[in-house]
Amino acid sequence: SDNNDKLLWEAGLNALQLGKGKQSVYNYKTNNNGKDLSNEQTRLTGNNQQQVPLSGFLSQPGISAPLDKNRLLFNETHTLNGNRMYKWNDDRSLRLQAGYTHDIIQQQRGNTQIYYQPTDTIQIDETYHYRLRSDIANLELRYEDNSSRNYISNRFTVDGEINRGRSEELGQTLQTSQLSAGNYFNLIRNRESGSWEFRSVTQYAYQPASLLLEEGKSKFNQHNFYTDNSAAYLRKYNGFTQQYKAGIQGEQATLKYTPTKQPNDFNASHLSLYLTPYFQLERGKWLTTLSFPLKAERYFSQQRSFLFFNPSTYLRYKLDYHWTFSLYGSLKRSAGDFSDLYPGLYQTDYRTWRDGNGLFPTNTTQTYNLYGEYKNTVQEFFITAALTYSRSNRNTLFEQSVSEDAIVYTRRELPNHSDSWNLSSTLSKGIYDWHLKTSLTLLLSRSNGEQLTRLADSKGNQQSLLQTYRYDYLKA
């Protein structure tokens, strides 16, 4: 921080109000000592796993360093939350929750990027002051009815946030905002032969974003309307579980982009039908699962249809209380997100450009994992080891053109692949009499892939060169 003599504080207030069939809880927290409260509201609502993921074109720059986060976060944060619950009986309840977070982060950053090219190595250094102001608000209403034969849950949410990042040295102001409203309905009916589950998700999101530079301003106005409706049947008998799930999913996704010299009205709306059978068998020391999701998807503006899949299997063997072994494998075919499908050229920061080049990226990934563990709670001794292999095959590859003033990524139609190996192990030993616990973690990884670079030859003509790379990493 620029002011080393700044007074540090951390404080919190809370209040609890109880009544017949209802209760209220209010919380307020504030600090400027580096403690991260950005996820405080998410933890209080507790249902972020049901949120529909959103893809944007601009994002605030992050920072990565081998330090604890509170040593990097020069902040001033205030967060306020109120929670009120009405409980009419043992089955039915209604919860209302509202929260607001105001956060200001100021940092002096230094960054070095090294690009290895066939004929040269380019190093780009930058040092700048960065100020990020964030205002985030959320509202949630949740109704639950949990009887012996039926479970009903309906959750309605409204979320909004404004993030404004500014760097004077870079001459860059980046603003990302979001306003979304969603409804999440879930019904489970229990029967003697099995159970039925019905889910319905509807969400609308508006995401305006802008990049202001000395040369001008780029604006992204993005609208997304998403719905997902499904029915599932689950049956368990004698250690064998089977589930069949079918549904329909659709999204209307549009973008209005300025400046208008690029495609300014982009539409990536799509509709899909999906089916997911799932099986699980447990016999003694063995447990195995098999899942085979299938999805038929149609992109209307692109006039493209796809069959996506994600089969996976899991096998676990528990030798005894101490030893457990497992094996996992999956194969997944997917398409790019909304920003990946945009066909034109757009700028993400003061020197970085991305060009979709009108291509439709797809990806097929296979993943395998081997895991083993030993535990002895009496002697407080634990050891785990995991080996993971992943390979991705893609139909497109970003070609990079790097100079000191600009970095341009252009998508090219070129089949390519990348693969990675990861080995991780943890050993832990505790000594109860000494109140001592020690642990050692080892992480070893290797990644291989392909890189496409645009270069100028001796005559000044531009050409593309495909290279392979390897990256090794060891941490203990």
Predicted regions and their residues:
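Membrane-proximal, glycine/serine-rich, low-complexity loop/turn segments characteristic
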Residues: 1-164, 174-201, 234-244, 314-339, ...
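Composition- and surface-driven signal marking solvent-exposed, interaction-prone regions
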Residues: 10-14, 27-30, 303-304, 382-386, ...
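Outer-membrane beta-barrel translocator domains and adjoining extracellular loop/strand segments
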Residues: 37-43, 106-122, 164-173, 208-217, ...
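Face-selective signature of the C-terminal outer-membrane beta-barrel domain
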Residues: 87-103, 131-302, 311, 318, ...
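Elongated scaffolding segments in large macromolecular assemblies
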Residues: 124-125, 154, 456-460, 467
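Hydrophilic extracytoplasmic domains
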Residues: 272, 297-299, 315, 326-329, ...
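Outer membrane beta-barrel transmembrane domains
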Residues: 342, 350, 357-358, 362-369, ...
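Signature for the C-terminal beta-barrel architecture of outer-membrane proteins
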Residues: 363, 388-400, 404, 410-424
